[in-house]
Amino acid sequence: MIKITKGLDLPIAGMPLQQISPAPAVKRVALLGEEYVGMRPAMAVKEGDRVKKGQILFEDKKTPGVYFTAPASGVVSAIHRGERRVLQSVVIDIEGNEAVAFTRYAADALAELPRDTVQQQLLASGLWTALRTRPFSKTPRPGSVPAAIFVNAMDTNPLAAEPQPIILAERAAFDAGLTVLTRLTDGKVHVCQPSGGKLGGHPAGQVCFNQFSGPHPAGLPGTHIHFLEPVSLNKQVWHLNYQDAIAIGQLFLEGELNCERVIALGGPQVKSPRLVKTTLGASLDDLLAGELEEGENRVISGSVLSGTRAHGPHAFLGRFHLQVSVVREGREKELFGWVMPGKEKFSITRTTLGHFFKRKRFHFSTDTHGGERAMVPIGNYERVMPLDILPTILLRDLLAGDSDSAQALGCLELDEEDLALCTYVCPGKYEYGPALRSVLTQIEQEG
């Protein structure tokens, strides 16, 4: 077991009840184009077209053969584009239950499938896009082979669902998914679970079960990769979440694309925080109807630390998100807030009274309590960064755009979510995720 000592479990109110409840029916689903780093779509459908679940909606021009498929059957009602015609979302009004059929395999035949057969089925179904590379967090190129594959079977994000019961309820499909993944690599398939996890005993020798304990970010793929299979420009690994591993198993066992997902609804503004079963890409306007407290709220697809704001063309469940978080918009101004004791405020630096209430859950809002200022190295980043890097120097180089120094300091191992806690504790109010993405893009382009 690998024990993480540095990090932070954010004490936010609205922890979901770890029991799956019925969810409001959703009438629309969507694929969000901006979730896929560097993707340029070649559209295969237009507004008004009727599509089946699993039918191709568009292909990546930069990576031919990578297809993005419909998560439900229905009619394409809108194709939203932003500045410079960047694809924002492809929206489908759900109608019927028609689905594309794929090849089924017996469970005992999966371990002998050729690599090309596995790749072609994943590509045709759209489940290939569940895989992400590290470094760069992009969809893998068809035909490439990773040094290892990581399946994340734990989640330490604030307000997240507990993965173990969900996996155990679909254990046969999960094990089948792991077997399929072993056909894509000559290395290990690492299953990362929390301390005391009940997963283990897979027949494939390539599957390795690892346990991590400690505060967030102990449950992030970047943490697992750093300690088990560090990457470089010449070494690439892939990762995916546990529900996508289940979906891969179901695809090969049943011959149908399963887009159901169990997600956590949580946050201070959710009336009844709980787990619900819904559809990949579900409309959050439909899903949250009648679920929120009064007032101006911010709906976040994903974690409050690293998720994306869900509004307008983006008001749908993200492809890689297993939770929806809702907090209050913090627009009010506080007179002389800096001299108040701050019983209702949480601080990692012990500057507010709320720091001393260890079991208290706080009603966080979007208020950052100030604007951008100088980046002051007071040890905050080191408190929440468990990786073997120099965070203060790395973050400085990211802001300066110094790609050579940032690469030497380990930025290739990171994704935006790995720096989310650094953004949260930053006294200068900087957003380090976009700075990291800019530097990674520069490194990739320069080779």
Curated annotation (Swiss-Prot):
Keywords: Ion transport, NAD, Sodium, Sodium transport, Translocase, Transport, Ubiquinone. It catalyses: a ubiquinone + n Na(+)(in) + NADH + H(+) = a ubiquinol + n Na(+)(out) + NAD(+). GO terms for biological process: sodium ion transport. Composed of six subunits; NqrA, NqrB, NqrC, NqrD, NqrE and NqrF. One of its GO terms (molecular function) is oxidoreductase activity, acting on NAD(P)H, quinone or similar compound as acceptor. Belongs to the NqrA family. This is Na(+)-translocating NADH-quinone reductase subunit A. The keyword Protease does not apply. Gene3D superfamilies: 2.40.50.100. The keyword Transport applies. Pfam families: NQRA_2nd (PF24836), NQRA_N (PF05896), NQRA_SLBB (PF11973). It comes from Klebsiella pneumoniae (strain 342). NQR complex catalyzes the reduction of ubiquinone-1 to ubiquinol by two successive reactions, coupled with the transport of Na(+) ions from the cytoplasm to the periplasm. NqrA to NqrE are probably involved in the second step, the conversion of ubisemiquinone to ubiquinol. Signal peptide: none annotated. Its EC number is 7.2.1.1.
